[in-house]
Structures are given as structure tokens and as C-alpha cells.
A protein has these predicted regions:
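Conserved C-terminal portion of the radical SAM core fold
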Residues: 4, 8, 51-59, 79-88, ...
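Flexible mid-to-C-terminal extensions adjoining Fe-S/redox cofactors in radical SAM and related proteins
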Residues: 1-5, 23, 236-300
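Short, P/G- and charge-enriched loop/turn segments at secondary-structure junctions
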Residues: 212-219, 280-282
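Short, small/polar residue-rich loop motifs at catalytic or cofactor-binding pockets
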Residues: 222-226
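Conserved alpha-helical substructure of the radical SAM core
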Residues: 1-111, 125-133, 137, 144, ...
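Short, solvent-exposed loop/turn segments at secondary-structure junctions
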Residues: 12-14, 23-27, 63-64, 92-94, ...
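Residues immediately within or flanking Cys/His clusters that coordinate Zn2+
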Residues: 10, 14, 220, 287, ...
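A structural signal for well-ordered alpha-helical scaffolds and beta->alpha junctions
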Residues: 2, 6, 39-43, 71, ...
Length: 300
């Protein structure tokens, strides 16, 4: 059953966030990096299902969706098919007219989420190379539009005491919702930014235990609910963005058989009917990518 899709329109980004798979891949394997933006014709040929009322999450794993060269054409085509769009972006380096064109395509069912972790004077401690001036322009245009708007804020040690100030700034700009998004992605690249324990995501302890023991009490994956079918910027299907991460991708059947899951030569219907895909979904607890990223934890 298909409830929606998570689509990485491009792996292009202007930022260099320490915890990002893009940053870490380029630092470790610069000779292997290539910029990709999903082919529009391939994308919509692959999506051979009814998109009316389905949620399409445009959120980058390696890149920021707003940097796809044909971004407006893509979102217009999704809206023409009745999809509900959820756009997640940092929002840097786009003009007022670009944002006005964006919101003219969206409607009241759609959401634009800005990822800004801190105040204008400190959020670039993590969002390296981001630009507050252009972000604020985008926020103000979106805030005045008919679509929903959100500010997503990850607590770090440099900003965990600024949450209420940021919440007030959010209200002042007119963004409708302020979300504190506690991260569990702490490792040698990001430990220097780790906040106090109360500001860390609830999966963190389970992930650390898994790293040392590879044992879990079960998995609770969103993809099993048909909500996270993922399409990569270079045009391949995986069950979710976690399984597209280079640290797990080539351990999965989707990374081992990339051509088999190319959106250029397949449809979502054929991929989901494939025995290998079905076997993967039927044995999620056996896969390292699921064990690490989606451990079953007590709800807080």
C-alpha cells in the first residue's frame, strides 16, 4: 500500500552541516562525489499510482530540494496530480520573487518547513554557510501565504538555551508552528555540538547499545506503514532515506542491485511487486539499517 513518498529532488546543497551524510561522504570520498538532480520524466513515469491526497515529502538526505533546477515545474506537476506537499529546506540563497512563485503553486494543504537551528547570530555553528538574510525573506513570504509553515529547531550545546528566543522570533515573523526536533545523530563528527541529555533524541541510547552489542528489542519502522518510499536524487528506489545512506546502502539489496531499482526502467508498482522488495519488508528486524535507525523505544 502506498500512502506517500519521500523524494530527494537533488543532492545539491549550499551548506556543510557536520552531521550530514553529504558532508561526511565528500570529506571521506571526494573523488567519488557527483551532483545529481532527479530526472522529471523518469520520476513521474515511475510514479504510476494515483497521487491524489498522497503526501509527498520533499526533504533532502544529501541535498536541499529547493536547488533542483526545475523545482517549480516539479511541484506544479505534483499539485496538478492532487498531491499534498511537505517541503523541508534550510531556505538559503533564494530571492523574494522565487519564494513568491513557490507559494503561488502551493495551497492550504501544503507545508513549508524551515530548518534553522538557533538564532540568526549562532545557527551557522551547525548550518555552515547558511544565510539568515535570505532565509528570513523566504520565511516572511511563506508566512503570508495560504500554506502551512514550520520552523524546525535542533537543540545543540550552542543553542539549547535560546529555544524560547527563537520561538518568539518565529511568532514575530509569522511562521505558524515552532518545532523542537531532538536529534539522535551524535557521533565523532557531531559530539562537540551535543546538548544536555534532556535535549537528545530518544533513539540515541538504543543506537549506542546497538553499536556495541548489535542487539535490539525490535524495530518500529515508518516504511512498514507505506509512508517512506524513497527516491534518490540519482534516480533509484529504496524503502526509506536511511537505507539510501552510504553507510548502509550497499549492504541492502537496493544498493547491491541499483539498476534493478532504477526509476528510469521501472515503476513503483513493479518495484513493490518484486520478490526481493517484499522479502526485505517482511524481514525488517534482520537488517542493520532498520536495527540502527528504527529501534523500538518507549514513547515519551
Amino acid at each position: 500500500m502506498v500512502k506517500g513518498f519521500h523524494i530527494e529532488l537533488t543532492n545539491i546543497c549550499t551548506l556543510k552541516c557536520a552531521g550530514c551524510a553529504r558532508t561526511q561522504f565528500i570529506d571521506r570520498f571526494p573523488q567519488h562525489w557527483k551532483n545529481h538532480s532527479v530526472n522529471i520524466d523518469d520520476l513521474f513515469n515511475f510514479l504510476d499510482c494515483d497521487l491524489s491526497g498522497k503526501r509527498i515529502s520533499l526533504c533532502g538526505h544529501y541535498g536541499d530540494p529547493i536547488y533542483h533546477p526545475d523545482f517549480h515545474r516539479i511541484i506544479r506537476q505534483f499539485k496538478n496530480k492532487g498531491a499534498i506537499l511537505y517541503l523541508t529546506t534550510n531556505g538559503s540563497y533564494k530571492t523574494e520573487s522565487w519564494w513568491e512563485q513557490t507559494v503561488s503553486i502551493l495551497d492550504q494543504k501544503d507545508t513549508v518547513q524551515f530548518s534553522v537551528d538557533g538564532l540568526p547570530e549562532n545557527f551557522t555553528n551547525y548550518r555552515v554557510n547558511a544565510d539568515w538574510k535570505s532565509i528570513e525573506i523566504g520565511m516572511k513570504v511563506v508566512a503570508k501565504s495560504q500554506c502551512s509553515s514550520e520552523w524546525s529547531y535542533i537543540p545543540f550545546n550552542y543553542n539549547e538555551n535560546n529555544i524560547e528566543e527563537a520561538r518568539e522570533l518565529c511568532k514575530k515573523i509569522g511562521i505558524k508552528e515552532f518545532i523542537v526536533n531532538k536529534s539522535d545523530r551524535w557521533d565523532k563528527y557531531t559530539d562537540h555540538l551535543k546538548p544536555s541529555s534532556s535535549k537528545i533524541g530518544q533513539r540515541y541510547d538504543s543506537q549506542q547499545e546497538w553499536k556495541h552489542t548489535t542487539t535490539i528489542s525490535g524495530v518500529d519502522p515508518n516504511c512498514n506503514q507505506g509512508q517512506s518510499h524513497f527516491i534518490t536524487a540519482d534516480g533509484h528506489y529504496t524503502p526509506c532515506c536511511y537505507s539510501a545512506d552510504f553507510r548502509f546502502y550497499y549492504q541492502t539489496p537496493f544498493g547491491k542491485n541499483k539498476q534493478k531499482y532504477s526509476i528510469k526502467y521501472n515503476t513503483i508498482s513493479s518495484v513493490l511487486a518484486d520478490k526481493t522488495t517484499q522479502d526485505f519488508y517482511n524481514s525488517l528486524e534482520n537488517h542493520k539499517v532498520c536495527q540502527f535507525n528504527c529501534p523500538k523505544v518507549e514513547k515519551q
